Amino acid sequence: MKSIIMAAGKGTRMKSDLPKVVHLAHGKPMIVRIIDALNTLDVEENILILGHKREKVLEVLGNDVSYVVQEEQLGTGHAVKQAIPKIKDYDGDVLIINGDIPLIRKQTLIDFYNLYKNENADGIILSAIFENPFSYGRVIKDGNKVLRIVEEKEANEEQKKVKEINAGVYIFKAQALVKALEKINNNNEKGEYYITDVIEILSNDKKVISYSLEDSMEIQGVNSKVELALVSKVLRERKNTALMEDGVILIDPATTYIDDEVKIGRDTTIYPNVTLQGNTEIGENSEILSGTRIIDSKIYDNVRIESSVIEESIVENGVTIGPYAHLRPKSHLKENVHIGNFVETKKSTLEKGVKAGHLTYLGDAHIGEKTNIGAGTITCNYDGKNKFKTEIGKDVFIGSDTMLVAPVNIGDNSLIGAGSVITKDVPSDSLSVERSKQIIKEGWKK
């Protein structure tokens, strides 16, 4: 099967410089969500109908995607016609879908396709029952057979009473679709070519059926930032519900933002106002407290993180972090490390049991087991041109307000006096102090 994804619309009501389909619905571009859903059907080629600022869509999807261009906006039928060169010699099925319905479920598309195949139909439309169907195309049927779809502006009073509406998703046999597209015209109030006219053309001598959705929210389109927020909320609720059903504790799901790819182990508690993004994994029995943001990181079991930011890092069992710590990319905290308030790490490994309680920067560093980093310690890793590494051994005590000017090595079991500026390697089992002599001048202030 091939698909045709309608993604050429300007999205005027979005009031944005971006094409509508690249806006993020719960952290992922809408067009990516549509393609992800279609991949469930083992689609051999997704053909995108692009128009307004198509280069922005290609930036998201890559230039190797299959697409055609609709230069003029002359209706949905005109859009699909642009894809005829890509399907005219194809003998399979073609699925047509709007690019702005990110709530469509994978299982819905599977059931939709299976009904089409089981009924040996020539075409099928996805429909839904709306109590207030205003503005939607109405599905006109004779028993189970679909006769036509009538747009709101073209419908008579009797047709407007029909509550079954067109959801904008179709499957047709490719050759039947191509022949029908050649017959559609723009003799209607809007002067546009409607893809829905294909239904009436095919129904004259072929079998066209419908599949009615149980959850009409799946076809919620996005035409404004308000509707974008609505679908994002639904997607967030789906993710949070699935996590809770798997044993995760969400104190307040309404204020918890967790991307689709995030994995969380059972009995982990997520507090309000937490954001978990990208390919983040969190183990079991951990606590992620309010104000925390974790991106593309792996968090093990029994970890406690409070009001901190963690990016592209690894946090092993029993670690405590925060409040107000920042783990920048390539930080690796091993078992039972403690990182306190206003501590920043970057491209550093802290071995088992290391403690850095407060006001510290550890960049391009390796710190051995059970070392204590005093308040105000800074690894001076950058000379204005290059980055250098600081190596600190195990069981080291770094006094407060110490500057470690890289490259520098501190040996095991060493002690660095508070206020020191260390520029030379310190051997193991040593005391190193580097600071000016304290001078006292009595009676200085008269």
Swiss-Prot record:
Matching Gene3D superfamilies? Hexapeptide repeat proteins, Spore Coat Polysaccharide Biosynthesis Protein SpsA, Chain A
N-acetyltransferase: region residues: 247-446
User: What's a GO cellular component annotated to this UniProt protein?
Assistant: membrane
Question: What note does UniProt attach to the cofactor annotation?
Answer: Binds 1 Mg(2+) ion per subunit.
EC number(s): the record gives 2.7.7.23, 2.3.1.157
- Fetch the InterPro entries from UniProt: Bifunctional_GlmU, GlmU-like, GlmU_C_LbH, Hexapep, Hexapep_transf_CS, NTP_transferase_dom, Nucleotide-diphossugar_trans, Trimer_LpxA-like_sf
State where the protein is found: Cytoplasm
Cysteines paired by S-S bonds: none
User: Which catalysed reactions does the entry list for this protein?
Assistant: alpha-D-glucosamine 1-phosphate + acetyl-CoA = N-acetyl-alpha-D-glucosamine 1-phosphate + CoA + H(+); N-acetyl-alpha-D-glucosamine 1-phosphate + UTP + H(+) = UDP-N-acetyl-alpha-D-glucosamine + diphosphate
Q: Name the Gene Ontology biological process terms.
A: cell morphogenesis; cell wall organization; lipid A biosynthetic process; peptidoglycan biosynthetic process; regulation of cell shape; UDP-N-acetylglucosamine biosynthetic process
| Stored Pfam families | Hexapep (PF00132), NTP_transferase (PF00483)
| GO MF terms held by the record | glucosamine-1-phosphate N-acetyltransferase activity; magnesium ion binding; UDP-N-acetylglucosamine diphosphorylase activity
The alphabetized UniProt keywords are: Acyltransferase, Cell shape, Cell wall biogenesis/degradation, Cytoplasm, Magnesium, Metal-binding, Multifunctional enzyme, Nucleotidyltransferase, Peptidoglycan synthesis, Repeat, Transferase
Pathway terms, separated by semicolons: Nucleotide-sugar biosynthesis; UDP-N-acetyl-alpha-D-glucosamine biosynthesis; N-acetyl-alpha-D-glucosamine 1-phosphate from alpha-D-glucosamine 6-phosphate (route II): step 2/2; Nucleotide-sugar biosynthesis; UDP-N-acetyl-alpha-D-glucosamine biosynthesis; UDP-N-acetyl-alpha-D-glucosamine from N-acetyl-alpha-D-glucosamine 1-phosphate: step 1/1; Bacterial outer membrane biogenesis; LPS lipid A biosynthesis
Where does this protein hold acetyl-CoA? Answer: 375, 381-382, 400, 418, 435
- Which cofactor(s) does the record list? Mg(2+)
Please list where the region (Linker) is annotated.
Answer: 226-246
User: Out of the domains of life, which is the source?
Assistant: Bacteria
Q: Chief subcellular site?
A: cytoplasm
- Enumerate the residue ranges of region (Pyrophosphorylase): 1-225
Catalytic residues in the record? 358 (proton acceptor)
Chain sites annotated for binding UDP-N-acetyl-alpha-D-glucosamine: 20, 70, 75-76, 137, 151, 166, 223, 328, 346, 361, 372
**Oligomer status and interactors:** Homotrimer.
Give the family from UniProt.
In the N-terminal section; belongs to the N-acetylglucosamine-1-phosphate uridyltransferase family. In the C-terminal section; belongs to the transferase hexapeptide repeat family.
Tell me the function of this protein: Catalyzes the last two sequential reactions in the de novo biosynthetic pathway for UDP-N-acetylglucosamine (UDP-GlcNAc). The C-terminal domain catalyzes the transfer of acetyl group from acetyl coenzyme A to glucosamine-1-phosphate (GlcN-1-P) to produce N-acetylglucosamine-1-phosphate (GlcNAc-1-P), which is converted into UDP-GlcNAc by the transfer of uridine 5-monophosphate (from uridine 5-triphosphate), a reaction catalyzed by the N-terminal domain.
Return the protein name.
Bifunctional protein GlmU
Corresponding gene? glmU
